[in-house]
């Protein structure tokens, strides 16, 4: 009945493309019955740098496939806002904050789409999406080309082996240059890429596109470009189209053995040969097809949808593994998931995102094997808990459709399930399986937060509790020295958004403190230790002795803390080794210089001693802590600071002022680019020096400059900066540095 009501209301709303709507409803019904074969399913994400047009593109996709009745613009200029930006803050700011999931039909294929944020502060949303998707569309701006966050998204897609198409958007913008964007795709991202279609005209003269494989031009008619018309290639563009097609064949031949043989034998590939070769190379991630268009002007979206079906993999063409954790084994073995869409195999699914909805906690799940039915009992591999599926839904932004069953390859959501992001759910008879976890970056910035009204403390703790469950990059702790609640995240915007959500969703206005950088402390060289913890107070006492080395890790592992047990024999019984490790990790929570965490170190336990009566777990915890403190007293300790990769775009006349500003902030310029009266500056700048840069850049470029930044690495800070940080810490904790007191006297 619910589906019939949805169908009748959607039919009343929908005006253009009635046949498409009918197809959607019939197909949605077949999806919920689980009979759509794998070959007709695509799980894709749309990712890019901020303001490349991802959400606008998704809006067009939903309109052309009959999923929505009318289109709206991203910033809510028409008072509505994009369907996929369902959060009020998203419509107000014109940015995507959370990943939004939807599904639609195109040419009898079911496409699950996740629209992801472009802002680096919300990078965990992109990580989650790519982990569970089979393919992706990387959107590039025809003016900006490959930008800061594009590089990050490319790295994330490589981490999860996600094949992707590239869509060069915004060809209608002044200064659009798709050739430069393609060149940057090859040089900056090291991708084997080539045009699959090219534009007819640019900027205000964009009339259509040329399909290089089918060798025809495509024109988009109608008020919203919904009518696609095919014509011959215009005579003035035949030469360029032939050259670009030859370039496409050569690039694919380098990546595909079958087409490579045809190329060497000088045989002309047919349209089907070329499409099959492009698909094989794309699925292997050895080639990326490049499509062009303008989502805002409704051009090039339908060919992109065709390319998603033709070139991106279905769930059977992607190998997904679960880890089988056998008892007594430190490392689990990998098990290949069976993506057959039936109930012959036991269910395995991954909870990749949590969201608090109107009806309770919503858990997004990707089904990797078997099927999940409403009322089924499933097991959480991490906690061992058994939970019942009370309600199973498919999502369209913030709207839902109830379904009875979800099969392998489907993305669905569950209600009322208590879990954390990254948990694996399994059927009862394979509860020791777990999917590979999602990579969670470390927070780089912290702020103190408190409610404006002291009576709202409960609301604050309730909101923070929910946000930390939803977002693994959002952390919170209570500072016992300053008696403040400290929240940590990926950037100022990240924490600012949560502060605003606290006010909107919990009626709890908050006051934020000044941003604090997440410094770290580390050693410069290895230091041996030999520490004995001994305590005797009548009766059984405490005794534990540890011998070993505290050594620094290489610069790539500055954020890690490692423990290595190299003991031989029973001087330290094996049951006490975890206690030594706990003591070591506890001691690393607070460094000796400025009280920040110690990282980039390895604790190597080589030997020790125990007492038959007095040795216990607490003894070796204290011994581990004491060993770290002893080693740090003898070591040279340095402060590590997060360094950001910054990309600045501004008019050429302000180049000198911008470079001077970067130098003042201890930045190191790594490269420069320029086109159409604008220059792009690439630099590595310490995060501690980036506060207030937005205001400075606007001031020195008359409001015409903009910048983006993302976390790059940790590195030792300059000696003068370290001295300044240590002095500030000593002043804040009530200790005056000896140097300053002498100077005052």
From Swiss-Prot:
Catalyses which reaction(s): GTP + H2O = GDP + phosphate + H(+)
Keyword list, A-Z: Elongation factor, GTP-binding, Hydrolase, Mitochondrion, Nucleotide-binding, Protein biosynthesis, Transit peptide
Amino-acid positions noted as binding GTP in the UniProt annotation, renumbered to this chain: 48-55, 115-119, 169-172
Cell compartment(s), UniProt: Mitochondrion
Stretches assigned to coiled coil: none
GO molecular function: GTP binding; GTPase activity; translation elongation factor activity
GO BP annotation list: mitochondrial translational elongation
Enzyme category, top tier: hydrolase
Pfam family membership, one: GTP_EFTU
Cellular component GO terms held in the UniProt record: mitochondrion
Statement: the UniProt record of this protein carries the keyword Protein biosynthesis: yes
InterPro entries per record: EFG_II, EFG_III, EFG_III/V, EFG_IV, EFG_V, EFG_V-like, EFTu-like_2, G_TR_CS
Residue stretch of the organelle transit peptide: 1-30
Primary residence: mitochondrion
Protein purpose: Mitochondrial GTPase that catalyzes the GTP-dependent ribosomal translocation step during translation elongation. During this step, the ribosome changes from the pre-translocational (PRE) to the post-translocational (POST) state as the newly formed A-site-bound peptidyl-tRNA and P-site-bound deacylated tRNA move to the P and E sites, respectively. Catalyzes the coordinated movement of the two tRNA molecules, the mRNA and conformational changes in the ribosome. Does not mediate the disassembly of ribosomes from messenger RNA at the termination of mitochondrial protein biosynthesis.
Family: Belongs to the TRAFAC class translation factor GTPase superfamily. Classic translation factor GTPase family. EF-G/EF-2 subfamily.
Protein's recorded name: Elongation factor G, mitochondrial
Protein source organism: Danio rerio
Biological classification of the source: Eukaryota, Metazoa, Chordata, Craniata, Vertebrata
């Amino acid at each position: 009945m619910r589906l019939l009501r949805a169908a009748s209301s959607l039919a009343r709303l929908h005006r253009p493309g009635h046949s498409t709507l009918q197809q959607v409803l019939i197909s949605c019904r077949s999806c919920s019955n689980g009979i759509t074969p794998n070959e007709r399913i695509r799980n894709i994400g749309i990712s890019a740098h901020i303001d490349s047009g991802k959400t606008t593109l998704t809006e067009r996709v939903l309109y052309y496939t009959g999923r929505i009745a009318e289109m709206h613009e991203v910033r809510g200029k028409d008072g509505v806002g994009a369907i996929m930006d369902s959060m009020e803050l998203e419509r107000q700011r014109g940015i995507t904050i959370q990943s939004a999931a939807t599904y639609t039909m195109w040419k009898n294929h079911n496409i699950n789409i996740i629209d992801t944020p472009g802002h680096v502060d919300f990078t965990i949303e992109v990580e989650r999406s790519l982990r569970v998707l089979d393919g992706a569309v990387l959107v590039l701006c025809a003016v900006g080309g490959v930008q800061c966050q594009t590089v990050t998204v490319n790295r994330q897609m490589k981490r999860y082996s996600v094949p992707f198409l590239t869509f060069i958007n915004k060809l209608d913008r002044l200064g659009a240059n798709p050739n430069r964007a393609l060149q940057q795709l090859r040089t900056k991202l090291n991708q084997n890429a080539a045009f699959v279609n090219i534009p007819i005209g640019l900027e205000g003269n964009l009339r259509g596109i040329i399909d290089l494989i089918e060798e025809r031009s495509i024109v988009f008619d109608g008020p919203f470009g919904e009518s696609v018309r095919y014509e011959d290639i215009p005579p003035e563009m035949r030469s360029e189209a032939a050259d670009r097609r030859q370039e496409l064949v050569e690039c694919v031949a380098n990546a595909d053995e079958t087409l490579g043989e045809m190329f060497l034998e000088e045989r002309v590939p047919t349209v089907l040969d070329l499409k099959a070769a492009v698909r094989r190379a794309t699925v292997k991630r050895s080639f990326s097809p490049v499509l062009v268009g303008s989502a805002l002007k409704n051009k090039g979206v339908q060919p992109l949808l065709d390319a998603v079906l033709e070139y991106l993999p279905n769930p059977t063409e992607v190998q997904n593994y679960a880890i089988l954790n056998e008892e007594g084994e430190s490392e689990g073995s990998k098990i290949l998931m069976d993506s057959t869409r039936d109930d012959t195999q036991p269910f395995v699914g991954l909870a990749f995102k949590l969201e608090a909805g109107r009806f309770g906690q919503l858990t997004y799940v990707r089904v990797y094997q078997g099927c999940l039915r409403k009322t089924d009992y499933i097991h959480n591999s991490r906690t061992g808990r058994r939970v019942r599926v009370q309600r199973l839904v498919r999502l369209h932004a913030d709207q839902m459709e109830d379904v009875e069953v979800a099969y392998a390859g489907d993305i669905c959501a569950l209600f009322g399930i208590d879990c954390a992001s990254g948990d694996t759910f399994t059927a009862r008879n394979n509860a020791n399986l777990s999917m590979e976890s999602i990579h969670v970056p470390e927070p780089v910035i912290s702020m103190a937060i408190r409610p404006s009204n002291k009576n709202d403390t409960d609301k604050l703790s309730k909101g923070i509790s929910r946000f930390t469950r939803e977002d693994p990059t959002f952390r919170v702790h209570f500072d016992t020295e300053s008696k403040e609640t400290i929240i940590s995240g990926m950037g100022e915007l990240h924490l600012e958004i949560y502060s605003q959500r606290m006010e909107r969703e919990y009626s709890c206005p908050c006051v934020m403190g000044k941003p604090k950088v997440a410094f770290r402390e580390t050693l410069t060289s290895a230091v041996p230790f030999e520490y004995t913890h001994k305590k005797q107070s009548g009766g059984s006492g405490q005794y534990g002795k540890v011998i070993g080395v505290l050594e620094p890790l290489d610069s790539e592992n500055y954020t890690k803390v490692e423990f290595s047990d190299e003991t031989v024999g029973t001087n330290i019984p094996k049951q006490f080794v975890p206690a030594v490790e706990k003591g070591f990790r506890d001691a690393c929570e607070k460094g000796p210089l400025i009280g920040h965490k110690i990282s980039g170190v390895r604790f190597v336990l080589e030997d020790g001693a125990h007492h038959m009566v007095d040795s216990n777990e607490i003894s070796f915890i204290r011994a581990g802590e004491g060993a770290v403190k002893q080693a740090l007293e003898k070591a040279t300790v340095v402060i590590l600071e997060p360094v950001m990769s910054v990309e600045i775009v501004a008019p050429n006349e302000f180049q000198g002022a911008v470079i001077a500003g970067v130098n003042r902030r201890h930045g190191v310029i790594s490269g420069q680019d320029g086109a159409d009266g604008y220059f792009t500056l690439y630099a590595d700048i310490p995060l501690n020096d980036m506060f207030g840069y937005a205001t400075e850049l606007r001031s020195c470029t008359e409001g015409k400059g903009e910048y983006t930044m993302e976390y790059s690495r940790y590195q030792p800070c300059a000696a003068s900066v370290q001295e300044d940080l240590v002095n500030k810490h000593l002043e804040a904790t009530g200790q005056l540095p000896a140097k300053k007191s002498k100077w005052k006297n």
